[in-house]
Amino acid sequence: MTDILIDNTATETVRTLIRAFPLVPVSQPPEQGSYLLAEHDTVSLRLVGEKSSVIVDFASGAAQYRRTKGGGELIAKAVNHTAHPTVWDATAGLGRDSFVLASLGLAVTAFEQHPAVACLLSDGIRRALLNPETQNTAAHINLHFGNAAEQMPALVQTQGKPDIVYLDPMYPERRKSAAVKKEMTYFHRLVGEAQDEAALLHTARQTAKKRVVVKRPRLGEHLAGQDPAYQYTGKSTRFDVYLPYGTDKG
C-alpha cells in the first residue's frame, strides 16, 4: 500500500476523498520511495529527495492544451468520435486520455486499479468539476476504482457493452520533455510495470461492441504480440485497432 501524509491544511473534502481508497496514513514522509501528500485542496504524488510533485490538473499546462485541441488529435480518429461512441478506458492512469475523450463529448468510464493513482485521478476530476472551464468535460467521466479486466464483465451485465474499449499500457517514454520524463519516473516507481497485456486485450475484445483501441509508441511492438486490424500512426504515437471477437469491421 501507498503512504499518505495528511497535512494540517488538508480540507475536509480532501480528507473524505482519501478515505475512499486503501492508503496508509503516516505522520511523516517515508525514508525512501514515493508517497502521497494531502495539503490544502489537493492530493499530490511525491518522491523522497525530490522537490517537484505530480498532481492531476486538467485546467492548465499540457492537459489544457490537449483538452482545447483534442478534436484534431489522432485519438479522436482512432475512436471514430464523430459516431459519438461510449468509451471504457481500461487503463486510466492519470486520466489524460480519458479527459481528451470526454472533451470530445464522449461518455467515458475510466478504470484505475492502483489506489494511489485512482486517488490522484479522483482528486483531479473533483477539482475539474469545480472549474467552469473544465466542469462540463469532467462530468462526462465516471471513475471506477479496481481492475478493469475483473470489473468490465460485471459492468456489462448492468450497463451493456461499450462501443470502444481504450487501452494505454505503460511503456518507456522516449524523446519526451524533461518534465514528462520526471513525471513518468515518479509514476513508474509508484505502480511498477507489470501488466498482463494478453489477458487485458482478451477481455477488451470480449467487451467492446465496435473496436478496441490501443495506444503505442510509433515504432513500438504490438500489444501482446498480436497484430491489429488497422492502425492510425502519428509522429510519435500509434493507435492500433483490434476488432471484437466474431466481427469483421470496426
UniProtKB/Swiss-Prot annotation:
Main location: cytoplasm
Statement: the UniProt record of this protein carries the keyword Transferase: yes
BP GO annotations: rRNA base methylation
SUPFAM superfamilies in alphabetical order: S-adenosyl-L-methionine-dependent methyltransferases (SSF53335)
Keyword Methyltransferase among UniProt keywords: yes
UniProt EC number: 2.1.1.242
InterPro entries: 16SrRNA_methylTrfase_J, SAM-dependent_MTases_sf
Matches recorded under Gene3D superfamilies: Vaccinia Virus protein VP39, YhiQ-like domain
Reaction catalysed by this enzyme: guanosine(1516) in 16S rRNA + S-adenosyl-L-methionine = N(2)-methylguanosine(1516) in 16S rRNA + S-adenosyl-L-homocysteine + H(+)
UniProt: S-adenosyl-L-methionine binding residues: 96-97, 168
Subcellular localization, as worded in the UniProt entry: Cytoplasm
GO molecular function, one term: 16S rRNA (guanine(1516)-N(2))-methyltransferase activity
A cellular-component GO term for this protein: cytoplasm
Assigned keywords, A-Z: Cytoplasm, Methyltransferase, rRNA processing, S-adenosyl-L-methionine, Transferase
HAMAP family attached to this UniProt entry: 16SrRNA_methyltr_J
Family from the record: Belongs to the methyltransferase superfamily. RsmJ family.
Described function: Specifically methylates the guanosine in position 1516 of 16S rRNA.
The protein's name in its UniProt record: Ribosomal RNA small subunit methyltransferase J
Species this protein is from: Neisseria meningitidis serogroup B (strain ATCC BAA-335 / MC58)
